[in-house]
């Protein structure tokens, strides 16, 4: 308190604590983690809450192939805040972390590590290398999660490669197959030529690509309905005009699709006629830079052209004109190039007309002999050569270079293609209505998630669940050697599941089909009993989509359905959806009661983080500089339902906010030195009014914090805590009570200490889910009463109402604080005029009307002076002083009369009344003498 040394300094109760001002979190946090591990904090917490209602937050498994990033940190910390809060709110809230361990990225890294040896390695050997790679990264990522303060059963995480998980996954597959929800068929699927495998919609990302969009004309060869003759158009000079951005698919063309409801025109250019949608004639001519053209005759309904025939542009074959509702007038010519092997709409309409499905592209994206002279060329290279040849042949009407959004593989980030292949599918269409009903039963947070999920389910195709790779759970299907029919029965599923539960899915590659399939199984089609095994594996989304069965139903500490799934917004097409589909298909209900969604982490300018751009921030860097609690505070301070900004400046600002919260706790701890809550707490009737106000402010904090935690709005909790610490405590209550705390030893001091103790105990519990390290450090320094736990996370959250004040009391103190603010303005003016220095040099006269006088007079004058932090306050009825914003109040300030007390620094007329202490006021002299 005093700047200059005084003989009375030692008589003051100045704050004293070993709780450091500088947090030093990077050094302290690891020691706390070691203590938590040593004392088995997580398992003891779950035991502590045994018998309480369960709250199950089911962890979406991150992919086990690298270090965590800020997005992973955001995800895990949100979950940890929820888990800690629920355990403090009267629930038993277990947290079982999981890891997604199969899939292409791990397989590709394993292959890369083998170099030339990969040519000679067996599938079983490759799988063993993949498992080793995944396991190593599970350990790395687990340590990184724990460093963030995340608590959970990291000793027993769920892993999609575990035998018991794989066995349950096989059973889910079997349940769906039994209901007819899984089938094998030829369909166009997303195909990555570089990874040589099919992809699901969830494995697609879109990026901007350049390409040539071309208008190609196909020469009419047959007119069975006599449409051309009817309109006087010569068939040998007539063409259909199509538009495409995928030149490489032209070898697969088997049809041209028109919309039967549209009108089409004959456009004469020179001596030749071109058929295109009437509404698109001008845009086509503009794109092709053709100025001289003529529309001949009346428009013709698209339906009239059905089943006309045309010559392929370069192959010796003919195609058919067909009709489809998917043809629009948004772009192109209204005549759609149709290659059933390379597009879903194309495939469906081709099936309707029994048009051949041609796929002249192999697994690696090279054209086959079906493409004629272009065989062997990769599709992207073939674009140029085909275009050049067609231009030379006069088949190209126009060409426009465009930029457009094109699908890419999320693994290798290269462009992908649509390619019809034999694949395994989940028939979403079969149970789509049931999925809609399940979506309606779920609480979506934010609530737009409901419509987003419904829209995605409505628009999606059947789910391609097979992959042509090695590292994953095998498709448990057998094939008849005689007729080739696939074979899946209850008995085969049971046998495969039992084998996998015992030996893991590697067993599929160890044994021949006859060693796995139960004896007595016969082909339902031909009665034969010799078998081969399927060589595909399941989509990893089927792996993680099976956790509701393999984890929630299998782990005794968990339950189905989960109370919550919580992941990023990309999981609407990923884990949220795959889990929903498999659960509805197998069990008829959603696997979750609620879904909470968070946004992406972006840089300080709102841009995506990329290593190449140098705008990334790594969790390890922030932990090294500031500590994990600052990352946790960043999470809590953010509106994570939208994209969350992160950067060094943001963390620097948050460290300042953290310092203010920490210093509030430090000030209170310093003033609790020597305070024993078991013996020193005073009764409520011995508290001063300002103490009651502080506790009422605490009650408001408890209410607001609970309201935030209950709806997972941690931003609301953070702001409530920050404002309480800075505005209510540091700027007001703690400042006002300094004289009581430092200069007295009686009931008044103990009343302030009692109040502060109650405040810090409650405040520390409130911040515990967020600042898990700092709250425990505070807890360690807090004096304890009987029944308090060693770890703050074992405590119950404070309940609202214990310190609540009525509206009249709150209104009174709102007005008192308003009066104080007006006094501070006048003191600032006096300080500027150099009539006073510190506020304790002032004496304040308050001119009041009756209402304000009664308000202020209800507070003892010494407490009122402390409230204003001045040496003296005088109340005068009537007008005077400087006008203020408080109606009926005028304020005047002057230098206080009397002398300055050497100990408390207040000015008083009774300085020196005690002969032994001539420089002290009467109060301080009596304290020193006591």
Outline where the language-model segments fall.
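N-terminal, positively charged nucleic-acid-binding surface of large information/translation enzymes
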Residues: 2-272, 339-344, 349-352, 356-371, ...
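Core structural elements
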Residues: 145, 168, 463, 656-669, ...
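Short metal-coordination and nucleic-acid-contact micro-motifs, chiefly zinc-binding Cys/His arrays
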Residues: 188, 405, 476, 516-522, ...
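Short cysteine-rich clusters marking metal-coordination/redox-active sites
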Residues: 192, 409, 480, 520-526, ...
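C-terminal accessory/binding modules appended to enzymatic or scaffolding proteins
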Residues: 321-322, 885-920
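Cys/His-coordinated zinc-binding microdomains
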Residues: 196, 468, 484, 527-528, ...
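Acidic, turn-prone loop/beta-hairpin segments
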Residues: 100, 189, 193, 200-207, ...
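Structured ligand/cofactor/substrate-binding pocket environments in proteins
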Residues: 71-83, 90-92, 99-100, 165-168, ...
């Amino acid at each position: 308190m005093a700047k200059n040394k005084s003989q009375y300094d030692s008589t003051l109760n100045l704050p004293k604590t070993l709780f450091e001002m500088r947090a030093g979190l990077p050094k302290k946090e690891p020691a706390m983690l070691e203590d938590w591990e040593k004392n088995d904090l997580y398992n003891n917490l779950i035991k502590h809450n045994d018998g309480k209602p369960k709250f199950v937050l089911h962890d979406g498994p991150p992919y086990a192939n690298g270090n965590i990033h800020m997005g992973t940190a955001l995800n895990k910390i949100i979950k940890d805040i929820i888990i800690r809060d629920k355990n403090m709110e009267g629930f038993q809230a277990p947290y079982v972390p999981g890891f997604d361990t199969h899939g292409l990225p791990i397989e590709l890294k394993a292959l890369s590590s083998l170099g030339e040896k990969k040519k000679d390695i067996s599938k079983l050997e490759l799988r063993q290398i993949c498992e080793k790679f995944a396991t190593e990264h599970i350990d790395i990522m687990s340590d990184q999660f724990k460093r963030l303060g995340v608590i959970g059963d990291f000793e027993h995480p769920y892993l999609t490669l575990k035998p018991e998980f794989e066995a349950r996954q096989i059973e889910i597959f079997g349940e769906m197959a039994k209901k007819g929800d899984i089938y094998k068929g030829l369909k166009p699927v997303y195909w990555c030529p570089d990874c040589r495998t099919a992809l699901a919609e969830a494995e697609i990302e879109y990026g901007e690509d350049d390409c040539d969009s071309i208008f190609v004309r196909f020469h009419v060869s047959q007119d069975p309905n006599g449409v051309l003759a009817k309109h006087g158009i010569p068939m040998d000079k007539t063409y259909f005009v199509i538009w495409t951005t995928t030149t490489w698919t032209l070898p697969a063309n088997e049809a041209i699709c028109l919309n039967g409801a549209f009108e089409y025109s004959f456009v004469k250019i020179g001596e030749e006629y071109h058929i295109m949608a009437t509404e698109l004639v001008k845009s086509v001519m503009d794109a092709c830079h053709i100025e001289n053209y003529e529309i001949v005759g009346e428009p013709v309904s698209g339906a009239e052209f059905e089943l006309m025939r045309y010559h392929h542009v370069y192959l010796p074959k003919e195609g058919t004109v067909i009709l489809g509702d998917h043809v629009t007038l948004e772009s192109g010519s209204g005549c759609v190039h149709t290659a059933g092997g390379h597009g879903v709409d194309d495939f469906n309409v081709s099936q309707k007309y029994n048009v051949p499905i041609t796929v002249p592209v192999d697994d690696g994206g090279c054209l086959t002999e079906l493409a004629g002279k272009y065989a062997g060329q990769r599709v992207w290279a073939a674009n140029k050569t085909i275009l050049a040849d067609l231009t030379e042949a006069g088949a190209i009407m126009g060409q426009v270079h465009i930029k457009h959004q094109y699908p890419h593989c999320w693994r290798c980030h290269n462009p992908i293609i649509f390619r019809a292949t034999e694949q395994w599918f989940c028939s979403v269409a079969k149970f789509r209505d049931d999925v809609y009903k399940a979506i309606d039963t779920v609480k979506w947070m934010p609530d737009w998630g409901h419509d987003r999920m419904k829209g995605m389910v409505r628009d999606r195709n059947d789910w391609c669940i097979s992959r042509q790779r090695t590292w994953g759970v095998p498709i448990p299907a057998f094939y008849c050697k005689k007729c080739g029919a696939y074979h899946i029965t209850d008995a085969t599923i049971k046998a495969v599941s039992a084998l996998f539960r015992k030996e893991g899915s590697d067993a599929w590659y160890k044994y021949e089909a006859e060693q796995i399939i139960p004896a007595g199984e016969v082909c339902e089609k031909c009665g034969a009993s010799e078998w081969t095994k399927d060589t595909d594996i399941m989509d990893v989304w089927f792996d993680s989509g099976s956790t509701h069965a393999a984890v929630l139903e299998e782990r005794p500490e968990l339950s189905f359905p989960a109370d919550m799934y919580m992941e990023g917004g990309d999981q609407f097409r990923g884990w949220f959806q795959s889990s929903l589909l498999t659960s509805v298909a197998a069990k008829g209900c959603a696997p979750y009661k609620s879904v909470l969604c968070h946004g992406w982490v972006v840089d300080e300018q709102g841009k995506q983080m990329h290593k190449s751009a140098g705008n990334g921030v790594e969790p390890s860097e922030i932990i090294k500089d500031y500590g994990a609690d600052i990352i946790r505070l960043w999470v809590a301070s953010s509106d994570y339902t939208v994209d969350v900004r992160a950067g060094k400046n943001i963390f620097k600002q948050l460290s300042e906010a953290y310092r203010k919260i920490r210093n509030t706790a430090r000030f209170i701890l310093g003033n609790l030195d020597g305070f024993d809550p078991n013996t020193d707490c005073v009764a409520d009737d011995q508290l001063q009014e300002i103490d009651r106000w502080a506790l009422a402010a605490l009650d408001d904090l408890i209410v607001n914090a609970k309201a935030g935690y209950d709806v997972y709005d941690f931003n609301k909790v953070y702001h409530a805590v920050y404002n309480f610490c800075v505005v209510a405590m540091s700027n007001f209550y703690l400042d006002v009570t300094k004289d009581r705390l430092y200069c007295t030893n009686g009931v008044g001091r103990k009343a302030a200490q009692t109040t502060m103790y109650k405040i810090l105990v409650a405040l520390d519990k409130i911040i515990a889910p967020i600042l898990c390290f700092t709250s425990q450090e505070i807890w360690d320094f807090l004096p304890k009463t009987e029944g308090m736990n060693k770890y703050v996370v074992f405590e119950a959250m404070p309940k609202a109402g214990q310190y609540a004040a009525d509206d009249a009391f709150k209104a009174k103190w709102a007005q008192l604080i308003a009066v104080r603010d007006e006094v501070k303005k006048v003191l600032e003016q006096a300080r500027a005029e150099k009539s006073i220095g510190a506020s304790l040099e002032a004496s304040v006269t308050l001119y009041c009307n009756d209402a304000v006088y009664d308000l202020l007079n209800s507070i003892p004058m010494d407490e009122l002076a402390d409230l204003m932090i001045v040496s003296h306050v005088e109340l005068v009825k009537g007008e005077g002083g400087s006008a203020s914003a408080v109606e009926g109040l005028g304020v005047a300030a002057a230098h206080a009369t009397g002398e300055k007390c050497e100990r408390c620094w207040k000015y008083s007329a009774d300085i020196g009344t005690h002969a032994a202490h001539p420089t002290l006021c009467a109060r301080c002299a009596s304290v020193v003498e006591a």
